Amino acid sequence: GYLRAPGSNGIAFATQSFIDELAHAAGKDPLQFRLDLLAQPIAEAGGAGPQAAPYDAARARGVLERVREVSGWGTKPLPRGTGMGVAFHFSHRGYFAEVVKASVSRDGKLKVEKVWAAGDIGSEIINPLNAENQVQGSVQDGLAQALGQEITIDKGRTVQSSFADFPLIRFAQAVPVEVHFVKSAVAPTGLGEPALPPVPPALCNAIFAATGKRVRSLPLSNHDLSWS
């Protein structure tokens, strides 16, 4: 079946997890570290095809600054076992930065408490309610991928055959998602897919902030998150 932003998901998880590690190794705030990397103009890097577009560092900074503001990033200390993680990504011509707040019990039970998403998808949003719904759906899909979705192969065949063993997020598991948009003077861009890639790395970065455990592979159902 269809999968939102399949290439960007893996790219974002690898790059945003590694950038988070660099920030902690440097003793820097992870969100400010990203802003510092984007402080200088970046040479346009585009390619061929309908999704190709130059990368705009100012727009990336804009969504990071907005998500810092709305999430209250760094404004108050969090108890051990609770953390906030951040990630951003550019895909389908859209820019999204997201903060995840999560808690992990000492025996490893994970609870995603809230997600804040800030997106720059151009100058005009025709249907704001539907745009917000698209982002909320992307975030829930991203959480499902991070928490328990995995494709395995046995003797040349996929083991998973339905949503019974490739689980989607259920209503009871749905997480509050707060959506904000940053307008820029460019034509409208992608929306349904670019909000998903930052979710898994932001969640794993939150887990590190909460427990000190660094997750470098998905899904999280394969990992022991217990801590002492």
Give names to the regions the model predicted.
Residues 1-228:
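Cofactor-binding beta-sheet edge motifs in enzyme active sites
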